[in-house]
């Protein structure tokens, strides 16, 4: 009887695990949150992380396409862009970077070489950077309301300069 109960519990755990694994699989291109069809008539901008997509979309609405380099759920410290992302990046007019995260420190030179006409905007310009207890700069600038205000101002200014309509 105990062995039968053990097998039922073990089977249930295995089935639940398989269901969870399958549910976590994604369709579409994760770097653009599944938005496959970008409007070719709209300018395209690229951001490093999802919170910055939100900022751009709140400022520009549907007037620009927004690509995200580090997909939701990926680590911005260790993520490596896909070849397709590098191709798509060349269509961006702007790259709105966070300023101090690992992905940008590692990849920014290569991203700029790949898209030499793309203008890189450091959205942390004007933000007083905080240091962690270990003395490193805290890259999570968007978490502060004051800093988010500066970030969105930097984004809005760049977009208005290039796309005044």
Language-model region placement:
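Sec-dependent N-terminal signal peptides of Gram-positive bacterial secreted proteins and lipoproteins
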Residues: 4-27
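Extracytoplasmic metal-acquisition and chelation regions
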Residues: 20-165
